[in-house]
Amino acid sequence: GLFSVLGSVAKHLLPHVVPVIAEKL
């Protein structure tokens, strides 16, 4: 369903987003 798609997208994006957020902190 839609949530499983969003979950897959989130798993792919998180590794890229987390370092960016960490740098800003």
Swiss-Prot record:
Keywords: Amidation, Amphibian defense peptide, Antibiotic, Antimicrobial, Secreted. InterPro entries: Caerin_1. Expressed by the skin dorsal glands. The keyword Membrane does not apply. The modification Leucine amide is found at L25. GO terms for cellular component: extracellular region. Transmembrane segments: none annotated. This is Caerin-1.18. It comes from Ranoidea gracilenta (Dainty green tree frog). The lineage of its organism: Eukaryota, Metazoa, Chordata, Craniata, Vertebrata.
